[in-house]
Amino acid sequence: MELPGSGYFQTLALFSVTFGGFAVLVAVFRQMIGGRLSDFDMFFIRSTLLRSFMAAGCSMLPSLLALFEISPSIIWRVSSLITGLLLILFTLTWYAERRAASGTPYTKAFRVNFLLQMLTAIFLLAIASGTILEPVPGYFAAAVTMIMVTAVIAYMAQLRLLLQAQTTGKRK
């Protein structure tokens, strides 16, 4: 059965993987210029790849569930539940790992990103429960898109920190 929004989810999955690959290339180029990768560089690469692959996998999840010929309502609830739980797990570990990797205070952009991710996770869990919102493709698509929006925001903020460290010579 063809789910509504399948083309969008396939495009989002492709974009997510492409974004992850591009982000890693920037870190590799930085390594070529500056030598050994720092703890923050490794955090940067890992978190970008994890978020990109999480968005890609969650984008493909409804199509996978549709192969089992279950009802669309269940597909959107299960997809929302799994994506919401993964996002909470990622966000909480990302918060702790960033502190360990950089040893610097959280920036305003980081805090905003953290809040957006947690709100997105809560939105997904609300979809999964079906009590506040009816589980439909549009809500799920908006939430997974927000995961990629927060990925871009985080990438730009982390890239700025990497470039500042490169110009000041302060690499952890």
Which role does the model predict for each range below?
Residues 81-84, 138-153:
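Small-residue-rich transmembrane alpha-helices that serve as helix-helix interface/gating elements
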Residues 91-95, 124-131, 149-165:
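Membrane-water interface at the C-terminal end of transmembrane alpha helices
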Residues 85-89, 108-129:
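Hydrophobic alpha-helical membrane segments
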Residues 56-64, 117-134:
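Hydrophobic alpha-helical transmembrane segments in multi-pass integral membrane proteins
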Residues 10-14, 37-57, 103-120, 170-172:
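Juxtamembrane helix-loop boundaries in multi-pass membrane proteins
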Residues 16-20, 50-58, 76-94:
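Generic alpha-helical transmembrane segments
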Residues 1-9, 63-76, 129-140:
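Helix-coil boundary and interhelical linker segments in multi-pass alpha-helical membrane proteins
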Residues 13-33:
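N-terminal signal-anchor/start-transfer transmembrane helix
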